[in-house]
Design a protein with these regions (language model features):
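Hydrolase active-site cap/lid region
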Residues: 155-213
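Short amphipathic alpha-helix adjacent to the substrate-entry channel of hydrolases
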Residues: 84-102
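Alpha/beta-hydrolase active-site loop
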Residues: 112-131, 288
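Glycine-rich nucleophile elbow surrounding the catalytic serine of serine-hydrolase chemistry
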Residues: 142-154
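Short beta-strand/loop motif that positions the catalytic acidic residue
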Residues: 233-235
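A glycine/proline-hinged amphipathic helix-loop "lid/cap" segment
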Residues: 1-64, 293, 297-319
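Alpha/beta-hydrolase fold nucleophile elbow
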Residues: 133-144
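Short beta-strand element of the alpha/beta-hydrolase
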Residues: 67-76
Length: 319
């Protein structure tokens, strides 16, 4: 990573912000303004659809695809974000793997606190399976809060008796609602995006009074990961959430899970979003694509109902 590249990223992330707490509407607008600046690959086909009763964005390579499906969960602290704000990440995974992706527009807090998001993502996965997608051809992926959902959706699916996906990829995941990781304090001021206060504020909206000491909220410290599929956890050394990934990786190894902890020095939260700007972002996405290509296989069974949405539900998202 050149100094010039890092300067561009720091300038973007450290823009002056309003003093004091911001409204949910302001948080959502600010996040959308930031994330829509990210570079999205060309040659993608985008279709708005529904999956498990929720809106979703279907992303495909424009030049034909391989047999594989990424179920993607966007970030945004469980309070903001959408499939559109994550399109750089979803699109880059699709472009690099040749797989299709469904990015789920799950319900957000504070209007819909825990466990609404997990209920939506599990329903989306169940809908994929019901449509004929083989679980060995599915990977869960997401960034930040969505990276946490990639893990907790897998937990909830396992506990519901569903067959598990072939792999999980989590970019800078949020995995500990107890906020007990040392990096929550040691990276304060180093992280150009988050402060403990900001993380705890959005976290409280998601919790809405729920006890954070439960596996679906704090898998890094409480989850039994027995039987989990292979996982790739990518995180930067400058993140408040660094220890969320390091502790989950340790729990996964203790449970016999095939896990790769991929730590990149000197980069911010969800640095993969800066593909085309940061060399490390492109390199990390390449590694994620290799990981997925090696672990996602299987076949597409007959009866792909997910592709047979009504015209009203399945319309081009391109302008």
């Amino acid at each position: 990573m050149s100094k010039e590249q890092r300067a561009r990223v720091d300038a973007l992330l450290r823009q002056p912000r309003p003093e004091g707490p911001r409204s949910v509407e302001a948080l959502r607008a600010g996040f959308e303004a930031l994330m829509t600046q990210m570079i999205v690959p060309d040659a993608l086909r985008l279709t708005r659809t529904t999956l498990g009763g929720r809106p979703a964005l279907h992303v495909e390579p424009d030049n034909g695809r391989r047999a594989g499906t990424i179920l993607y969960f966007h970030g945004g602290g469980w309070v903001y974000g959408s499939p559109e704000t994550a399109l750089s990440l979803t699109g880059n995974l699709v472009a690099r793997t040749g797989f299709e992706a469904y990015s789920v527009d799950y319900r957000l807090a504070p209007e819909h606190p825990f466990p609404a998001a997990i209920e939506d993502t599990v329903r989306a996965y169940r809908a994929l399976l019901d449509s004929g997608v083989d679980p060995s051809a599915v990977a869960f992926a997401g960034e930040s809060a969505g990276g946490g959902l990639a893990v907790t959706t897998c937990l909830a699916a396992r506990d519901a008796g569903l067959p598990l996906p072939a792999a999980v990829v989590a970019f800078s995941p949020g995995l500990d609602a107890t906020r007990t990781g040392e990096s929550m304090d040691t990276k304060e001021g180093v992280d150009p995006i988050f402060t403990r206060e900001a993380v705890e504020r959005t976290g409280a909206m998601y919790l809405a009074g729920a006890d954070p000491h439960q596996p679906l909220l704090s898998p890094a410290v409480l989850a039994d990961l027995t039987g989990f599929p292979p996982m790739l956890l990518q995180v930067g050394t400058n993140e408040l959430l660094l220890d969320d990934s390091t502790r989950l990786a340790a729990r996964a190894r203790a449970a016999g899970v095939d896990v790769i902890l991929d730590v990149t020095a000197g980069v911010p939260h969800v640095f993969q979003s800066f593909a085309g700007v940061l060399d490390e972002a492109d390199e990390a996405l390449d590694r994620a694509a290799v990981f997925l290509g090696q672990r996602v296989g299987g076949r597409i069974r007959a009866g792909r109902a997910a592709r047979a949405s009504s015209p009203a539900e399945n319309r081009s998202a391109e302008s």
